[in-house]
């Protein structure tokens, strides 16, 4: 057999590894060889991979320097000299710029400044919050015209003794009664055990001769009639409730006494209700 390597032009690199056998009288000078199949490495599964012996072979044994060039192989640099260490001196206070000195020497001054800034900020925030709350509460308060109607001044000399005068206050009838000495003694002598809503006469008046009441029946809100009823005080025509001259319920379905508003005597002849 005769072995001839085929070579032809640009395909020579591709065809150089091929051979063709031709029958002949001469023996081939070079026998065609078949590349041997590489053997697969056998791994020892019982041997730990992350051991001192396995890792020591991969560790760097000498310093490497990065090189760049056409004929220079690439390498890894494990040591850098161009790294800039960050400097925070601009953000530090002058008292602690020197790293060789202890910061305890200037700690009191630095703490005092921090406390001062915190205190000033707290006062400013509290003042702003106070103004905001004040404005919010003021917006919810009644206007000047409403406040003017919230109080009423009554001249007492216009009400004769033994008479009752009605006024309009906050949309409700207001009774002002000038009692006689007989009425005062009569109401003061009433036993509390006889009353449905026990209350002494002196607890309902500031001056014995003057009784100030809200003229609304405590049963269903009707307006009682003054100087009427079985007890000479007030009488509700709706359901027959009887009140005495002190405004206390004595007979009928009303459960409570007539309400006594807040009032104040500014002089002997003037009273302000509200």
Swiss-Prot record:
[2Fe-2S] cluster binds at residues 217, 219, 236, 239, 241. Its EC number is 7.1.1.8. Its cofactor is [2Fe-2S] cluster. Keywords: 2Fe-2S, Disulfide bond, Electron transport, Iron, Iron-sulfur, Membrane, Metal-binding, Mitochondrion, Mitochondrion inner membrane, Respiratory chain, Transit peptide, Translocase, Transmembrane, Transmembrane helix, Transport. One of its GO terms (biological process) is respiratory electron transport chain. It catalyses: a quinol + 2 Fe(III)-[cytochrome c](out) = a quinone + 2 Fe(II)-[cytochrome c](out) + 2 H(+)(out). It is found in: Mitochondrion inner membrane. The chain crosses the membrane at residues 104-140. Residues 187-272 form the Rieske domain. Pfam families: Rieske, Ubiq-Cytc-red_N, UCR_TM. It comes from the Eukaryota. GO terms for cellular component: mitochondrial inner membrane; mitochondrion. PROSITE patterns: RIESKE. GO terms for molecular function: 2 iron, 2 sulfur cluster binding; metal ion binding; ubiquinol-cytochrome-c reductase activity. It is an enzyme of class 7 (translocase). Proteolytic processing is necessary for the correct insertion of UQCRFS1 in the complex III dimer. Several fragments are generated during UQCRFS1 insertion, most probably due to the endogenous matrix-processing peptidase (MPP) activity of the 2 core protein subunits UQCRC1/QCR1 and UQCRC2/QCR2, which are homologous to the 2 mitochondrial-processing peptidase (MPP) subunits beta-MPP and alpha-MPP respectively. The action of the protease is also necessary for the clearance of the UQCRFS1 fragments. This is Cytochrome b-c1 complex subunit Rieske, mitochondrial. The lineage of its organism: Eukaryota, Metazoa, Chordata, Craniata, Vertebrata.
């Amino acid at each position: 057999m005769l072995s001839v390597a085929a070579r032809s032009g640009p395909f020579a690199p591709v065809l150089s590894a091929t051979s063709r056998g031709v029958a002949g009288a001469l023996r081939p000078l070079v026998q065609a060889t078949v590349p041997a199949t590489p053997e697969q490495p056998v791994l020892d599964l019982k041997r730990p991979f992350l051991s001192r012996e396995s890792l020591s072979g991969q560790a760097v044994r000498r310093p490497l320097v990065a090189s760049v060039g056409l004929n220079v192989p690439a390498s890894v640099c494990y040591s850098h000299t161009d790294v800039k260490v960050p400097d925070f001196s601009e953000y530090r206070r002058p008292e602690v710029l020197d790293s060789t000195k202890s910061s305890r020497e200037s700690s009191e001054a630095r703490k005092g400044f921090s406390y001062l800034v915190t205190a000033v900020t707290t006062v400013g925030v509290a003042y702003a919050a106070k103004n905001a709350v004040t404005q919010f509460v003021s917006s919810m308060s009644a206007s000047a015209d409403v406040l003017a109607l919230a109080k009423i001044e009554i001249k007492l000399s216009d009400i004769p003794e033994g008479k009752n005068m009605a006024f309009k206050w906050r949309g409700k009838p207001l009774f002002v009664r000038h009692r006689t000495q007989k009425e005062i003694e009569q109401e003061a002598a009433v036993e509390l055990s006889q009353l449905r809503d026990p209350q002494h006469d002196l607890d309902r008046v500031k001056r014995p001769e003057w009784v100030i009441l809200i003229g609304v029946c405590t049963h269903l809100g009707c307006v009682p009639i003054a100087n009427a009823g079985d007890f000479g005080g007030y009488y509700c025509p709706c359901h027959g409730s009887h009140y005495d001259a002190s405004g206390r319920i004595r007979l009928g379905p009303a459960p409570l006494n007539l309400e006594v508003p807040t009032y104040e005597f500014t002089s002997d002849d003037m009273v302000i209700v509200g």
